[in-house]
A protein has these predicted regions:
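A general structural signal for well-ordered alpha-helical segments in protein cores
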Residues: 1-4, 72, 84, 97, ...
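Residues in the short beta-alpha loop(s) of Rossmann-like NAD(P)-binding domains
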Residues: 48, 116, 142
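Hydrophobic packing within well-folded, soluble alpha/beta domains
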Residues: 4, 19-21, 35, 42-44, ...
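Glycine-rich cofactor phosphate-binding loops and adjacent beta1-alpha1 units
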Residues: 11-13, 53, 58-133, 175
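Mid-domain Rossmann-like dinucleotide-binding core that forms the NAD(H)/NADP(H) cofactor-binding site
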Residues: 1-69
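Hydrophobic residues in well-ordered beta-strands that form the structural core
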Residues: 44, 112, 136-138
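C-terminal hydrophobic helical "lid"/dimerization subdomain
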Residues: 98-102, 144-194
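Glycine-centered, small-residue-biased loops immediately flanking beta-strands
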Residues: 17, 108-109, 187
Length: 194
């Protein structure tokens, strides 16, 4: 959660911004809530319909299933052709990194919140950054202030983490936890240490 606060700050999300979040896993869901708290309009893209439904419950204004519609076209449609002021790439693939850059508006920012696995590279035309004046950032850590802020946002109910925890599994059933995650069943799986 604290690292998401750091990512939102690095992306300069402001009131009235159109924010695209690519990926609606646990981290994407936290970014949805933080962007809404900052006054942004939130668009989230993910191929898993059940996750998109949860994202709507947590405040996402619009959802995009990239298996059913073109993400870039839909973002442009939703933003009157501008693109997203801020993009958070919360999925670690080179494809989503390229998508984030393409979806950003002029003077937009793109935050690579997930490292790629396996490690990969993207071909990048510097003219895209130059002429669109895009700021590219990455985030993975947090400050002590971010940690304190995360606790306060959860304490005051501004960020709802219970919606994100989909399974609580005992240590004895830890193999079931891995299976649940591998099959994309639910969101955050917590292993309870009894």
């Amino acid at each position: 959660m604290a690292c998401c606060i750091n990512g939102n700050r690095n992306t300069n999300i402001s009131t009235g911004d159109d924010v695209l979040i690519i990926g609606s896993g646990p981290i994407g869901m936290l970014h949805v809530q933080l962007a809404k708290h900052n006054g942004a309009r939130v668009i989230i893209s993910d191929p898993i319909e059940s996750r998109l439904e949860i994202a709507k419950e947590l405040g996402a204004d619009d959802t995009i299933n990239p298996t059913k519609e073109d993400t870039i076209e839909r973002v442009k449609e939703l933003t009157e052709g501008r693109g997203a002021n801020a993009v958070i790439v919360a999925v670690g693939t080179t494809e989503t990194a390229r998508l984030g850059i393409e979806a950003s508006a002029i003077c937009g920012s793109v935050n690579f919140f997930a490292g790629t696995y396996p490690q990969g590279e993207i071909a990048l035309d510097p003219n895209v950054i130059h002429y669109k004046q895009i700021v590219l950032t990455g985030s993975h850590d947090f400050t002590p202030h971010d940690f304190t802020m995360a606790l306060k946002l959860m304490e005051y109910g501004i960020v709802k983490v219970k919606h994100i925890i989909s399974h609580v599994i005992s240590l004895d059933d830890v193999s079931k936890a891995f299976e649940t995650v591998a099959n994309h069943e639910g969101l955050k799986v917590v292993v309870k240490m009894d």
